[in-house]
């Protein structure tokens, strides 16, 4: 019997290496509660079902209400424009000083009245709870959940404080001038220093002692369906000043206001809302919350406490989704995956796994190449095996089960990212790569031939007629594979390292299940897998 045959014979004795073995050991890596799926899988989608009777009612009301309300909104905006001009005349777009008192005294009452009239003309009935804090009590309002462009009504009720807005919005005709009258903090998407400048500007205004107007911030940074509170951005909490949480509720039987990434468009929502007899909104001003000394030094901690406080009052859960999840949703759609496939709870995953946007986006490309052929944009065992160019075996099922955290028989993108970071990358060490190379290099000449490669894989996976020529050619540049080529391929494909360590775990379990005299018997495979000498082979397996 040659060396290949000896190694194959030993590998084939491992229980679980054959396809027909019944039962698999449970995953050896414990599930971390912090990686459990979020209570709300997708807060960026809204599906509103409108019955036939409601459609008829909206059509009949809309014949009268839609044109009248649209006309009134247009008239009010035109009436507000001169006051906005007076407020901002001869002022730079990015203010370095607050608008003078005489301008504010003339324009603020008029703009507040017209803004209230506009929302009233659109059919909004507003219920206000709590007391609005003064600039000295709370320089910053934090408003959540942010679910629609109609949330601007909170700004009106709060007395027209300053907003944080995109620089492009200030360039919009008519609306841009009205926005500038609020003395907004403008954010530029092309300026690399914009984030730092925005934080500094918020801090300067919040600590001005009432010289500047209060600032109203939507800390979620994007619109959701109000089913949860997503991660709060720390910008409003960095100054370390007291904030007043503001809750928004829309207690309507038919939701015509929610504006999410998947749902009705801006124009559709305007039409649907204008066709309602009225739209109810509740605005609750909660007690002012001052940061502790620890929270002043840790704005993320401060933001987390305020979010939990608001979520408790709203009786909804919190998740670690962010605006970056929306970007991943768009990327998933461009890769022909369902948009929701890109959701990973970016804030949690990036923090716990030390992954940045570019790293997760790269994993999405990899995931799409595997899952694009499957239904629903999820990886099944067949797609997993096809990607690895290996048959469905118990070793492969072990690895698949480790990735499949919720045991639903498929791997979603979130599970894929966690699996690579938690399972595969730690297993893909220099030592493991060396051990794997030694196992395949049966004749110990420093190269792996296709015969050696096929023989070991066929035996360890329990598939004697396995064709792995395609996988071998992907690794090899010539007729054999050097250690450097083997290492380069392993580093680019960490999934194979986990397959190998899973195989070693199964082999170790088998050794311990044998009688003591058999455990101490030397074998080709044990000598090659263990980096130590033959005499220490058994103890090394225990360490594994």
UniProtKB/Swiss-Prot annotation:
Classification via PROSITE patterns: EF_HAND_1, EF_HAND_2
GO biological process, one term: membrane organization
Residue span(s) of domain EF-hand: 391-426, 428-463
Example of a GO cellular component annotation carried by this entry: Golgi membrane
All ranges on the Cytoplasmic side of the membrane: 1-58
Pfam families: Acyltransferase (PF01553), EF-hand_7 (PF13499)
Enzyme Commission number(s) of this protein: 2.3.1.23, 2.3.1.51, 2.3.1.25, 2.3.1.67
The UniProt record lists the keyword Thylakoid: no
Induction remarks: By inflammatory stimulation by LPS and by ODN1826, a TLR9 ligand, but not by poly(I:C), a TLR3 ligand.
UniProt motif HXXXXD motif: location: 146-151
Entries under PANTHER family matching the protein: LYSOPHOSPHATIDYLCHOLINE ACYLTRANSFERASE 2, PHOSPHOLIPID ACYLTRANSFERASE
Chain's role: Exhibits both acyltransferase and acetyltransferase activities. Activity is calcium-dependent. Catalyzes the conversion of lysophosphatidylcholine (1-acyl-sn-glycero-3-phosphocholine or LPC) into phosphatidylcholine (1,2-diacyl-sn-glycero-3-phosphocholine or PC). Catalyzes the conversion 1-acyl-sn-glycerol-3-phosphate (lysophosphatidic acid or LPA) into 1,2-diacyl-sn-glycerol-3-phosphate (phosphatidic acid or PA) by incorporating an acyl moiety at the sn-2 position of the glycerol backbone.
Protein name: Lysophosphatidylcholine acyltransferase 2
Species: Mus musculus (Mouse)
Gene: Lpcat2
